[in-house]
């Protein structure tokens, strides 16, 4: 969820906020200032990022209802999960989003709010048909992911199958070399792999790019967890990957126990792994 990196047809868009940008209204000065801040937050270090998104959340919440607030909350809703914003900030964003949707239903924004509710565990008081449909779609996606198996090769040619990893805790991470939030979380994945591999953690990082693109990227950065290639996007489709990064944790019994629809910090990954009994 998120300012995730989305891929449509043959064109790469490095932000799911772009659909809102295409219909962005002319902003008054206050809204222009908020819009400018949104354009800067991806470049901030984590500690500054957390403070900035908390401040922006309160500013957006206080805006009067109208097209400007609708556009800004749409953009912000797709950025605020790109790190550890904290539950209070996420709750403010969700409440502002629900207020906007009461006035002006929007299928895309309802989908964003549903993902906030499901995967960031915020409380949402909204009962529009579109929001209920978005939650139902997430339920269907999760059922499909739980039933999914796959076999893919890593960069050395070794094949990995999900069903053969029972007894291990498996963290599947969908990513790409061109995706900034994906690149930002990779050092944390490496640290987790080194720390918990002896305890049975397997990390499978899956890219839809060709091996000729992925291999030099990984070699240069010296990541050692398994990196798999899915250039036909078959496994991406099985997991309903509409934006990256996305991460899924399966426990030792093969049950899907945690999901993330955007970039996670090391602390957030640790919380996901605890749900599979790894700590």
Q: What do the predicted segments below correspond to?
A:
Residues 166, 174-191:
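Conserved redox-active cysteine motifs that mediate thiol-disulfide chemistry
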Residues 1-10:
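Bacterial N-terminal signal peptides that target proteins for export
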Residues 168-170, 174-178, 210, 243, ...:
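Short pre-active-site segment immediately N-terminal to redox-active cysteine/selenocysteine motifs
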Residues 27-112:
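Alpha-helical, heptad-rich or low-complexity scaffold/stalk segments
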Residues 151-170, 196:
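A short beta-strand-turn-helix
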Residues 106-149, 163-166:
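N-proximal helix/coil linker or "cap" segments that precede and/or mark the start of modular domains
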